[in-house]
């Protein structure tokens, strides 16, 4: 996790990252069930005596490099951004990937959807409507998600079908996100969005399973992730 000093570009004695790398899981492997803790963790249990506990009120800052490439193919042109968001938000259906990166991937999918541009019909595959987005850069995210896991420079690719009302097609999404341990300042991740595509940011974020709140300063923070999306 990056300190606030690093995010704001303030000088200070840098520390080596203690995060360790982990390889992505095989995407072909099926999982029979998903589960979540149903009771508070007992400190007497093995391995949890020095575990970093999650304080839902603690505001943290994560700084990172990111790349997102998004291609959406549909049977008909989208009329509104709400139609686009409804389709793209299905990217993590039956998610198999790095669990710790999933909230950040949700943000990148949301970001990519806001920057989609239609491909000229003459260039589209078999004349079907196609939309593409490619965004990359550095950013930081204020959040209340607790301590984040190691994030190494490992791209992950997702391909999902969608069938939403009148629209059906495929989503292809390639994302990379990894820790930025530099002391250079970075913009907030929300600054990379094309906000002209929608008016209600909180509502559209929720379509991607992101619960956001606005600070007194007017900046958005990621408060939590919805378990229903």
From Swiss-Prot:
UniProt membrane topology term: Peripheral membrane protein
Pfam families for this protein: Vesiculo_matrix
Localization in the cell: Virion; Host endomembrane system; Host nucleus membrane; Host nucleus
InterPro entries associated with the record: Vesiculo_matrix, VSV_matrix_sf
PTM (free text): Phosphorylated by host.
Region (Disordered): 1-23
One cellular component (GO) term of this entry: host cell nuclear membrane
Superkingdom of this protein's organism: Viruses
Low complexity bias spans: 1-10
Role of this protein: Forms a double layer around the helical nucleocapsid, the inner matrix layer binding to the N helix and the outer matrix layer binding to the envelope glycoprotein. Plays a major role in assembly and budding of virion, by recruiting cellular partners of the ESCRT complexes that play a key role in releasing the budding particle from the host membrane. Condensates the ribonucleocapsid core during virus assembly.
Quaternary assembly: Homomultimer. Interacts with viral nucleocapsid; this interaction contributes to the virion assembly. Interacts with the viral envelope glycoprotein; this interaction contributes to the virion assembly. Interacts with host RAE1-NUP98 complex. Interacts with host NEDD4 and TSG101. Interacts with host dynamin. Interacts with host NDUFAF4; the interaction inhibits viral propagation and is independent of interferon activation. Interacts with host GTF2H5; the interaction may inhibit host transcription.
Protein name: Matrix protein
Gene: M
């Amino acid at each position: 996790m990056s300190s606030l000093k690093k995010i704001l570009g303030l000088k200070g004695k840098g520390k080596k990252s203690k995060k360790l790398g982990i390889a992505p899981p095989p995407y072909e492997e099926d999982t029979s069930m998903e589960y979540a803790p149903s009771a508070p963790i007992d400190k007497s249990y093995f391995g949890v005596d020095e575990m970093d506990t999650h304080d839902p009120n603690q505001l943290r800052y994560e700084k990172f490099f990111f790349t997102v490439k998004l291609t959406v193919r549909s049977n008909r042109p989208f009329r509104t951004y709400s139609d686009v968001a409804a389709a793209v938000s299905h990217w993590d259906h039956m998610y198999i990937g790095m669990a710790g990166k999933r909230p950040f991937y949700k943000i990148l999918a949301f970001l990519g959807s806001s920057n989609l541009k239609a491909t000229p019909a003459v260039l589209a595959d078999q004349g079907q409507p196609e939309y593409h987005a490619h965004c990359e850069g550095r950013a930081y995210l204020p959040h209340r998600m607790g301590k984040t896991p190691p994030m190494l420079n490992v791209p992950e690719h997702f391909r999902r079908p969608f069938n939403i009302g009148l629209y059906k097609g495929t989503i292809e999404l390639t994302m990379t996100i990894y820790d930025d341990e530099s002391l250079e300042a970075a913009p907030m991740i929300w600054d990379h969005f094309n906000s002209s595509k929608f008016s209600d940011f909180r509502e559209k974020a929720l379509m991607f399973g992101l619960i956001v709140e606005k600070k007194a300063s007017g900046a958005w923070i990621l408060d939590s992730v919805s378990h229903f999306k």
